[in-house]
Amino acid sequence: MINFNYETEFSLDNEQAFTDWLSAVIVSEEKNEGEINYIFCDDEYLHKINVEYLNHDTLTDIISFDYTVGNEISGDIFVSVERVEDNAKDFNVSFEEELKRVLAHGILHYCGYKDKSDADAELMRSKEDEKIAMFHVEQ
């Protein structure tokens, strides 16, 4: 089950479309969907988590806590809406595209993809692009 929680004024326009897409992303990686909680927040909220739990005194767009057991992926994914907005501007993409990238990024970590080395980051970016292309909204 995929849940969206809001600790900021932001909210998704079409939660069901995002839920369907993220479920398809999980299936495409041959994993089973456990409980995945997305928590949308601001920089201050996520910075506190980064310092308290990871001992990193920096701003970030996403922090994920992985509770995956075996093939069933579960966890809490915190997303700073402010960072996503700034990154979208920096990368010259729409807010929605950058948001999709971040949402997929969290799932891909749970599927075992890393991004610390250049090679791993390149594979992660490729997988993000592949998963973003899977998103569609029925018109």
From Swiss-Prot:
Recorded GO MF terms: metalloendopeptidase activity; RNA endonuclease activity; zinc ion binding
Stored Gene3D superfamilies: Metalloproteases ('zincins'), catalytic domain
Subcellular location field: Cytoplasm
EC number in record: 3.1.-.-
Any GO CC annotation of this UniProt entry: cytoplasm
Enzyme class: hydrolase
Keywords, comma-separated and alphabetical: Cytoplasm, Endonuclease, Hydrolase, Metal-binding, Nuclease, Ribosome biogenesis, rRNA processing, Zinc
Source domain of life: Bacteria
Main subcellular location of this protein, as a coarse class: cytoplasm
UniProt xrefs under SUPFAM superfamilies: Metalloproteases ('zincins'), catalytic domain
Cofactor(s) the protein requires to work: Zn(2+)
Binding site for Zn(2+): 105, 109, 115
GO BP, sorted A to Z: rRNA processing
Cofactor note: Binds 1 zinc ion.
Annotated InterPro entries: MetalPrtase_cat_dom_sf_prd (IPR023091), YbeY (IPR002036)
Family classification: Belongs to the endoribonuclease YbeY family.
Function, as annotated: Single strand-specific metallo-endoribonuclease involved in late-stage 70S ribosome quality control and in maturation of the 3' terminus of the 16S rRNA.
NCBIfam families listed in its UniProt record: rRNA maturation RNase YbeY
Protein name: Endoribonuclease YbeY
Lineage: Bacteria, Pseudomonadati, Bacteroidota, Flavobacteriia, Flavobacteriales
Gene that encodes it: ybeY
